[in-house]
Amino acid sequence: MARLLFSGQRLRPSFLRSYIRANPSSTPSATRAAINYRYNSNNAALQSASSSQGALTGIKIIDLSRVLAGPFCTQILADYGAEVTKVEAVGKGDDTRHWIMAGEKASWNESSGPISNYFAAVNRNKRSITVNFKKAEGRQLILDLIKDADVVVENFKPGTMERLGLGYDVLKELNPRIIYAGLSGYGRTGPYRTRGGYDPIAAAEAGLLHVTGEKNGPPVRAGIGLVDMSTGLFLHGAILSALIARARDGTGQRVDASLFETQLSLLTNVGLAWLNLGIEAERWGCQHPSIAPYDAFKTRDRYLVCGATNDNQYAALCCLLGVEHLVTDPRFITNPLRVQHREELAALLGPIFASKTIDEWIALFEPSGLPFGPINNMEATFAHPQTAARDMVIDVPMDAACAGSIKVIGPAVKFGDSKTGLRTGPPRLGQHTVEILEEIGMDAEAIAKYKEDGII
């Protein structure tokens, strides 16, 4: 970060800006102008990008993470324009390259090395380099990459990076501006810090599985890695915040995220009901613990989720269903009463929903303004008109695919002025090793020797 000479000392522009705001009359106008100019120019990578660039164009990220939470985080940052270098194990790569579904193998070119849809889902817009962490030369390569980077992301067990000589203290000494983002199962401190991090385990221990499933049934795991991806979302926001803090203060910092804490934070109102009222949470299936009716109702052919969040919506729903008399039924006049008598209300509404097809109900609900939606399978989800309208399915060229391209799910957030989206498809294992090493100054002979020695 730019430093300025002030009263014989080198001080941060952020301090100087605070000083001139507090002492405007004692600071010459030329000095104020110079300080403001230097302050606003100190981190060019975070200046406003043009419409042809991503919001994070110029930010360099070294991604040492594997599987889902970390790669999901770095893919979001890559979609926003960051240059992400994915460091993988020699010969094997990210574990998810090998997580192939039945029947999937035939869609990939065998000569392209290990690859899967699971890996492709969270690794686009990245370059891949393979490095042997077990060799000192490999660890030195990692240091060489981090020396000029803005962010490093890793999801090893706490203490692993330190044992490799790649801990935060080492990296901070090498690059004081580095944002070190560590992700683990339980965080850097506490009695469980050395345990591995797994999505279903965090979901179990931090309460999610306890509240998920049918009322009288067993706990049910979400159909996606919800805790993993939520942790990636939290971490990507923390990294952006750390970058903004660095633009202000000039130095990087450590960011510490965990699956366990992510899931604890997601308990929100359910958690506060226990903490403040001592009310234990229950499983409610598709129902809402505080609102009735709100459920997945079986129609003649599929399920429809709908509900009424207030008395006006309840009256409108009753009218739409042709049961206006239930509006004034003393059991259902207010939401607390409807919650108290939810089973009786569901028994009355269930046969009505079962009398029509999902398409017939959608036609009735569409103009009503009531909250509703069919439970869609994957075919219906990706055929949804809103999916197409928001460009949420994108064809990406990919030579590893037999078809020459694969379809991926587009970025969830759109920017008004900055470019987001797909620049490159998911990389083959080690696809960019040579070009990355050339960028840090290695010649062809040295690269060949490293390859021969199993360092890359």
Swiss-Prot record:
Its EC number is 2.8.3.-. The keyword Disulfide bond does not apply. GO terms for molecular function: acyltransferase activity; succinate-hydroxymethylglutarate CoA-transferase activity. Keywords: Acyltransferase, Mitochondrion, Transferase, Transit peptide. Disruption phenotype: Shows significantly reduced growth but does not affect tolerance to benzoxazolinone. Residues 1-33 form a transit peptide. One of its GO terms (cellular component) is mitochondrion. InterPro entries: CoA-transferase_III_domain, CoA-Trfase_fam_III, CoA-Trfase_III_dom3_sf, CoA-Trfase_III_dom_1_sf. Acyl-CoA transferase; part of the Fusarium detoxification of benzoxazolinone cluster involved in the degradation of benzoxazolinones produced by the host plant. Maize, wheat, and rye produce the 2 benzoxazinone phytoanticipins 2,4-dihy-droxy-7-methoxy-1,4-benzoxazin-3-one (DIMBOA) and 2,4-dihydroxy-1,4-benzoxazin-3-one (DIBOA) that, due to their inherent instability once released, spontaneously degrade to the more stable corresponding benzoxazolinones, 6-methoxy-2-benzoxazolinone (MBOA) and 2-benzoxazolinone (BOA), respectively. This is Acyl-CoA transferase FPSE_08120. Belongs to the CoA-transferase III family. Its main location: mitochondrion. It comes from the Eukaryota. The keyword DNA-binding does not apply. The lineage of its organism: Eukaryota, Fungi, Dikarya, Ascomycota, Pezizomycotina.
